[in-house]
Structure formats: C-alpha cells, structure tokens
C-alpha cells in the first residue's frame, strides 16, 4: 500500500519538482501562516472577526510572492507573466475562497470546544488546520493549470477520459460538477455575507433558514401530544407521530434525519449507472442536493413521503404492481400530492393494481383514522387556515416555489411602497387569480396525463413530468418537496443515448432545481413573531421548471395523441 502511494506521488511529481516544490511549499506555508497569525494578533480587538480580515490580506500578499517562487524555482516556465499570474490567482484564489468560508466554521467550532483559557487561540489553530488542507491541492492546480505544458496538461487527460465515458456516465459527471459548483458558491456567498454584514451563520442564511431549525418535527410532536389534527398531515402520518411522540425529541430528530439522509444516499448509489469512482459521485450528488439538506434542517416529515414514493417507483419499475399499489397508498395517506403517480397505472393498463390502490387508500385511511381518533373537522379547519396563510398572504412567498407564487411575486415586489398596502395588493391578487389558477393547473395536469398515457414517452420522461406536476402545480409546495425530483433524475441519468444538446439542456435544468439558492435573500418584513425573507429559489426554480416542462412537451402533437388514443383502446393489454 505504501509503495503504491509512493509510486503515485512520483508519477504526479516528475524529476526534481517534488523536492523543489516541497522547499518552496514549506516556505510559503510558514510565510503565509506567519503573516496570517501576525495580522490576527495586530487586528484582534480592533475589528470584528479579525481573523477573516487577516485571512484576506495574508492571502493577497502570500499568493503574489508564491507566484514568483513557483515560476522561477519550481516549474521554470518562460514568459507569460500576466497569464500565469492570473491563472495562479485562479488556483490559489479558489482555494482561498473556499478557505474563507471554511475558516469561520473551524474557528467557531474550536471556540466552542476549547477550554475558556484557550479560546483566544482558536483563530490561530483554525488557520493552521486550514493551511494543512490546501498544500497538495494547490500543487496539483499549479502544475496542471497555472504552469502547465502540453505534455503534463491535466485538461488533456480529462478530455481523454471524458471521451471514453458513455453518455449516461457523462450526465452523472456533469450533474455532479454543477451541484458541487452550486454548493461552493453557497459557501462563498456565506463568507461574503459574513464580511459585509459582520454576522456569522446561523445569524445569516447559508443553505437553510436558521430561524426554523428542526421546527417542523418539533411542532408536529407538540400537536401529536395534544391529540389534535396536525397541519396538513393525513391520519397515517399523524397516527405514527402520536405513537412516537412521547420519546425524547432530540433522539427522535436524530433518528429520523439520519434515516432520511441514509435512505437518500443509498437510493442515489443504487440508481447511478456504473462508472469509475461511483461512491465519490454519489457523495457529490448527495452533498450538492439542496432539498435533502433543507428537509434535514427543517426535519420535515416529507422524508417519509419520499420513502414511500421511492418504494412505489422501484416496485413499479420492477413490475411488482401489488407492492407499487401498497407504497403509493401509504404515500397518499400521508400527503395527497403523490396521487399524481396513479397515472402510471393507466399508462401500462394496470387496472387491477389501480383498483387495489384505491381500496388500500380507503382501508389505510379508515384504519388510521379509527386508531388515531383522528378529528377530521379540526383537520379541515387546520388545512383551511394553513392554505389561507400560505396561499393568500405574502408569508407563502418565503419557501414556496410553485407556479402560483411565480404569478404572485411580481405583484408583491411592484407594490412594495409600505405595509400594509403591499400585503393588501398581494392578498387581493391571490384571491382573484386562485380560481383561474386551479382550473388551469387541473387542465394542464389532464393534458400531461393524456400525454403520458396515450403518447407513452420514455419512463424517465413520464416520471419527470408527473413529478414536476406534483411539486410545482399546487398552491403551496415548500422547498423540501423538491427531494422527489431525485427519482426521475436517476432514471434520466440511466436513459439511453440522446442528442448531446438535449442531454446537456435537461441536465442543466435539473441541476438548477437541485442547487442551493436560499443564500440569495432579501428581507421585506421583520417582527418579533415573523420575518418575511424572500430567496432566489422562489423565483428561479419555478422558472426553470416551466422551461423544462415546455421542453419535455415540445414534441407533442394532436395527431400523435389521436393515434395514441386509438392504439391504447384497440391494442390488447
């Protein structure tokens, strides 16, 4: 194992470069960290978050002197000063940007862990840990990008390896890289917000909203203990929560969140096509999937709905229709929106499975209502209150990413001339367009259903169309419901080859729906009871979903639909 590692290092560092790089690297490390420590010492007490300013200033000076040392003593390239200096900044600057986001996490964690007498040393220890993580990555970036030649070009090797991959493998890599870039941008914006606003997460938004940490689970437990109907949850989910509500809240939260994350990661791993370093790409896709972390951050019970929907999709794909009917009945008895997937039974003429699903829905609902003493009148009032609160008032704009919010958002922004005028205008507009919106979405869903049943697009496309309808068509649909998108995404990644432009376009649209966007926010209203903070996702995600929906239906024609209807009813099962 050790010999293999040594040989690998020799292949990366030909000739004397390893020794020269080591000497220069040691000097750069000592110089950079010494300058950082000196600036921390000098600025401490004069500026808030002095270690952040020290990190920025020391990086600027250290990167410039490192450029000359690497150019003249390690890689010994000729000319191209400005080009190589800019490239050097691109390598070191990227590392510095990531470090700028990671440094406060290290420092604040060390401050929390260190004894009181040593807390003042946290910035120095955090800087040392961060420095140790960047040495090897910096060399690879400098050698293969800043001072590269044609012979040692990492880019050329990447192109060669890319050419050997199948199109499904390329989709995985492309999607993973976009998700990773989105995650790093979120980190960078978090660090920038820290510098500009002098606040550190969780006082500023990163991937989540820190005001509601695990609140969905805790509120549901409180409701379950009071034996009242819970928000918009159906009897099955509330009955389960009542059964476990007497347990310790933190343990329940840890168990549920761990279960959802582990299930999500395992689904991604099993669903990816075979490719090199599959485990690494699985981690990359999971870490970059914002809906998973938002669901975990809120500890929302949508995780159980997702598990049931995943069970349905897997069972349906494998032809186990009885299990598919069972899992879909469980999902619908937790929340109604997964009922859209019953269209797949019609698509494959699985009428018996459809009938079994309907019977199971009634039986499970009746049994859970009886066992949990479910109060349907209170449930109806709670649903109505929740709908009025989220559907008509501007509060629903904060986390909801539906097409309905896409219509309301311009009205709210255009009437921001002071409260309560903007609220009244938004409420009036919401009530005005709500009936028409409901009719339009029902009509669009009927159109999509007809397309799925009679035209019979590929399974991944049918599943994606129905999932988009499930997530974006309702009046209210919060960010964590986007977790369902990973199911059609995995089938798309395994789809047969298609035109490259089509593959790239769909991959980009799906990535936009999954990357974090909550870091781009603006606060419109603040009170002791509630803050209204709009984020970019409430606008960009429905927009991307609309574009993707139109693209998936671009080949529709009434002639094909007519032919499909004729074939559907004339062909044998």
Describe each region flagged by the PLM.
Residues 62, 301-310, 336-339, 481-490, ...:
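Hydrophobic core segments of transmembrane alpha-helices in multi-pass, intramembrane catalytic enzymes
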Residues 307-318, 344-349, 353, 486-501, ...:
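Transmembrane alpha-helices and membrane-interface helical segments
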Residues 157-323, 348-462, 466-479, 562-570:
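Primarily membrane-embedded glycan-assembly and transfer machineries that use lipid-linked glycans
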Residues 491-573:
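Aromatic-enriched
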Residues 328-345, 473-484:
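Transmembrane helices and adjacent periplasmic/lumenal helix-loop junctions
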Residues 78-95:
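Juxtamembrane helix-capping/reentrant segments at transmembrane boundaries
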Residues 1-14, 154-168:
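Short, Lys/Arg-rich, polar N-terminal cytosolic tail immediately upstream
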Residues 12-20, 46-61, 114-133, 166, ...:
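Membrane-interface starts of transmembrane alpha-helices
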């Amino acid at each position: 194992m050790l010999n293999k590692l040594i040989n690998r290092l020799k292949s990366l560092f030909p000739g004397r470069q390893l020794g020269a790089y080591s000497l220069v690297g040691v000097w750069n490390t000592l110089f950079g960290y010494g300058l950082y420590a000196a600036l921390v010492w000098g600025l401490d007490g004069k500026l808030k978050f002095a270690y952040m300013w020290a990190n920025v200033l020391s990086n600027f000076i250290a990167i410039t002197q490192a450029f000359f040392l690497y150019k003249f003593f390690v890689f010994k390239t000729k000319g191209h000063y400005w080009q190589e200096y800019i490239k050097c900044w691109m390598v070191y600057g990227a590392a510095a940007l990531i470090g700028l986001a990671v440094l406060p996490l290290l420092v604040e964690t060390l401050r929390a862990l260190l004894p009181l007498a040593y807390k003042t040393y946290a910035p120095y220890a955090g800087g040392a840990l961060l420095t140790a993580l960047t040495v090897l990555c910096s060399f690879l970036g400098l050698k293969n990008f800043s001072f590269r030649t044609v012979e040692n070009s990492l880019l050329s090797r990447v192109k060669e390896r890319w050419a050997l991959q199948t199109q499904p493998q390329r989709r995985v890599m492309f999607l993973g890289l976009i998700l990773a870039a989105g995650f790093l941008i979120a980190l960078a914006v978090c660090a920038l917000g820290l510098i500009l606003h002098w606040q550190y997460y969780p006082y500023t938004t990163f991937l989540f909203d820190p005001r509601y940490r695990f609140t969905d689970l805790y509120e549901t437990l409180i409701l379950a203990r009071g034996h009242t109907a819970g928000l918009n949850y159906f009897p099955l989910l509330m009955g389960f929560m009542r059964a476990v509500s007497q347990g310790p809240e933190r343990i329940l939260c840890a168990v549920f969140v761990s279960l959802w994350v582990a299930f999500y990661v395992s689904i991604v791993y099993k669903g990816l096509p075979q490719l090199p370093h599959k485990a690494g790409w699985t981690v990359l896709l999971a870490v970059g999937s914002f809906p998973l972390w938002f669901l975990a951050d809120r500890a929302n019970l949508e995780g159980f709905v997702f598990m049931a929907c995943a069970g349905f999709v897997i069972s349906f794909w494998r032809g186990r229709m009885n299990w598919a009917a069972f899992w879909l009945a469980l999902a619908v008895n937790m929340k109604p929106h997964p009922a859209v997937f019953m269209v797949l039974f019609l698509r494959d003429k699985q009428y018996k499975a459809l009938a079994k699903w309907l019977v199971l829905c009634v039986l499970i609902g009746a049994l859970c209502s009886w066992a949990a003493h479910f109060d349907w009148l209170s449930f109806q009032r709670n649903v109505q209150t929740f709908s009025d609160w989220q559907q008509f008032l501007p509060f629903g704009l904060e986390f909801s990413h539906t097409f309905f919010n896409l219509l309301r958002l311009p009205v709210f922004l255009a009437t921001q001339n002071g409260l309560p005028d903007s609220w009244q205008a938004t409420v009036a507009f919401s009530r005005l367009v709500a009936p028409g919106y409901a009719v339009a979405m029902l009509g669009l869903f009927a159109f999509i259903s007809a397309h799925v049943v009679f035209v019979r697009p590929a399974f991944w496309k049918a599943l994606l169309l129905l999932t988009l309808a499930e997530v974006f068509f309702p009046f209210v649909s919060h960010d964590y419901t986007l977790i369902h998108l990973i199911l059609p995404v995995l089938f798309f990644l395994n789809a047969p080859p298609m035109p490259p432009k089509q593959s790239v376009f769909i991959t980009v649209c799906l990535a936009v729906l999954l990357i974090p966007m909550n870091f781009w926010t603006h606060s419109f209203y603040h009170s002791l009871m509630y803050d209204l903070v709009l984020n970019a996702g409430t606008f960009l995600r429905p927009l991307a979903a609309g574009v993707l929906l139109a693209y998936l239906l671009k080949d529709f024609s009434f002639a094909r639909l007519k032919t499909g209807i004729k074939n559907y009813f004339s062909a044998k099962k």
